[in-house]
Amino acid sequence: MAEIRQRRVLMVPAPFQGHLPSMMNLASYLSSQGFSITIVRNEFNFKDISHNFPGIKFFTIKDGLSESDVKSLGLLEFVLELNSVCEPLLKEFLTNHDDVVDFIIYDEFVYFPRRVAEDMNLPKMVFSPSSAATSISRCVLMENQSNGLLPPQDARSQLEETVPEFHPFRFKDLPFTAYGSMERLMILYENVSNRASSSGIIHNSSDCLENSFITTAQEKWGVPVYPVGPLHMTNSAMSCPSLFEEERNCLEWLEKQETSSVIYISMGSLAMTQDIEAVEMAMGFVQSNQPFLWVIRPGSINGQESLDFLPEQFNQTVTDGRGFVVKWAPQKEVLRHRAVGGFWNHGGWNSCLESISSGVPMICRPYSGDQRVNTRLMSHVWQTAYEIEGELERGAVEMAVRRLIVDQEGQEMRMRATILKEEVEASVTTEGSSHNSLNNLVHAIMMQIDEQ
């Protein structure tokens, strides 16, 4: 009897800390369902994670790009360059690869596999590690830009106005970038939003969180949308090592703190902070009289490697044990810890999902792109976060922390966060909406492969 060949799926994640883990969680799930999975990784930002994912094959594209290219080009220009460089390399790999590839799944920001799949007549789906609201907001931004309806970036009062037919988002909440020009951003978003030729869109989100946006996405692109998240909560999810080394001693420090007393601060893997803002944040945390755990990546504050510029009073607070500073933390474990009462972050979607799934309310300080969209969702739709806007001042930082950790308002927000956590937990259990969406996704991929 002839051996039945496994269905082979090629998956292409974006080489960034905020993108890789969710794609690898999806890969683990598909592998558990009997698919043969090959991950195509970039040489840029490479870290060998193969030992964490037995049964999954890995191939590295020699893109010749480095961290210095990000610094010299800027993030936006780097992403455009990455897609340009990697398209012929992927085509060469597929042409010379011994194993036949049946299906391609690619991250929305590394869209070069879409063109390769079309040239080689391979079925494909796009994976979005972003919120569905962000996907829609990119289109809203492009439409308003094309129609000349975007307010100038210095027209503050107009930027505060609600975008027509996109309540509750203001113009200032749309996913502008701090990393390049509007013209180049439109080129990126046009490619990222080119999804109608895909056989489906996979979102790391949940129907219980974004039902209306998921429905809108399905209507807009005319293809099935699979809200399968939060993927880090699926039963088959395996731990994807961080691209940064985690300092686990912070968990021992948390054990010494009172329940729901700690404000955890992490601005993600890409966001940068000015030293003036960092000083105001530091003093605000000191003046709040709450214990704090602060993740400060080397170089993330105005490119500085040393923290010598932070005030002596802050350093003394850390020395005395009320504060703890690390270069990177095991974030999911931190957020699940009983001592953590709030999460100060940039509004990145991974941080939002991890906070929601842990029942932890947030203070959001968005910087660029989807962070503004997510922050508006958290603060005005789900009401589980505060947004801290304008110029940072230590008094405002102190007040925000105390509102969240100490005041009645924060307790009510924590209750809403707990309810949202329970809804998300239910969505990933058997018969939950995300679990069913994963099953539908598996069936759809099998059908597409078998029909070839």
Swiss-Prot record:
Q: Pfam families given for it? A: UDPGT
Q: What is the main EC category here?
A: transferase
Keywords on this record?
A: Glycosyltransferase, Transferase
Q: Name the InterPro entries for this protein.
A: UDP_glucos_trans
Binding-site list for UDP-alpha-D-glucose: 269, 329-331, 346-354, 368-371
GO MF term list: quercetin 7-O-glucosyltransferase activity
Q: Does the keyword Ribonucleoprotein apply?
A: no
The answer to whether keyword Transferase applies is: yes
Please state the Enzyme Commission number of this protein. 2.4.1.-
Family, as annotated: Belongs to the UDP-glycosyltransferase family.
What is the role of this chain? Possesses low quercetin 7-O-glucosyltransferase activity in vitro.
Q: What is this protein called?
A: UDP-glycosyltransferase 76D1
